[in-house]
């Protein structure tokens, strides 16, 4: 059975209601996943869960977090067949693009996804986005960093956020979709990257501080 690591960074998909609006809460989302029986269906890949700390609204995502995500994938690369990164929508496309260059030689799926409506709400789009992202990561047909949202799988460094309130939140104006999910997941084979040789090479981003900039 294929094994997938879910990396939860924060974002709308795992937020809960608070007195001050929606906010992420440590430990909540892992328990929420256990309440979705379809995630353990026979056709699903085996998955494990890793929660970053602290959880972030993606508007606060920085190069430091990009390095953390990329380093975690590199550390776990030989243990899993694919990866799903749960992320807020505000900077999801930026993170996907950054990871596509940081994970040089990647030959496994890294699928970023999230939701416009929290999983705790009845109309959440998070359940379908997560389940389909897990299936894509487990199938291993796409071997690159990509972004799945609203029925479309997009190349990570070609995606851009299109809508703040629509469920089809991302588009790829300059490159075709890698796959579309309807009754089945249909891959656009001509758009996929070929297999990579030579193994994964991690390229971390430099962190610049104000002190360094003044030197």
For the regions a protein language model found, what residue spans apply to each?
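Predominant activation on well-ordered alpha-helical scaffold segments within soluble catalytic domains
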Residues: 67-70, 74, 96, 100, ...
């Amino acid at each position: 059975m294929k094994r997938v690591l879910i990396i939860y960074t924060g974002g709308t998909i795992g937020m809960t209601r608070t007195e001050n609006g929606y906010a992420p809460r440590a430990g909540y989302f892992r328990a929420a996943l256990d309440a979705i029986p379809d995630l353990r269906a026979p056709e699903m890949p085996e998955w494990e869960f890793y929660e970053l700390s602290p959880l972030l609204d993606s508007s606060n995502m920085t190069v430091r977090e990009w390095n953390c995500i990329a380093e975690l994938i590199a550390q776990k690369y030989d243990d899993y067949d694919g990866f799903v990164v749960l992320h807020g929508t505000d900077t999801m496309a930026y993170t996907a693009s950054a990871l596509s260059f940081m994970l040089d030689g990647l030959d496994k799926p890294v699928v970023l996804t999230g939701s416009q409506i929290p999983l705790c709400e009845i109309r959440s789009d998070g359940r379908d986005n997560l389940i389909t992202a897990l299936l894509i990561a487990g199938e291993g047909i796409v071997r690159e960093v990509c972004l799945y949202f609203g029925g479309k799988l997009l190349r990570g460094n070609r995606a851009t956020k299109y809508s703040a309130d629509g469920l089809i939140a991302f588009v790829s104006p300059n490159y075709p979709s890698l796959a579309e999910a309807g009754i089945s997941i249909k891959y656009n084979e001509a758009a996929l990257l070929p297999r990579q040789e030579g193994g994964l090479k991690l390229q971390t981003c430099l962190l610049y501080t104000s002190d360094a900039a003044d030197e």
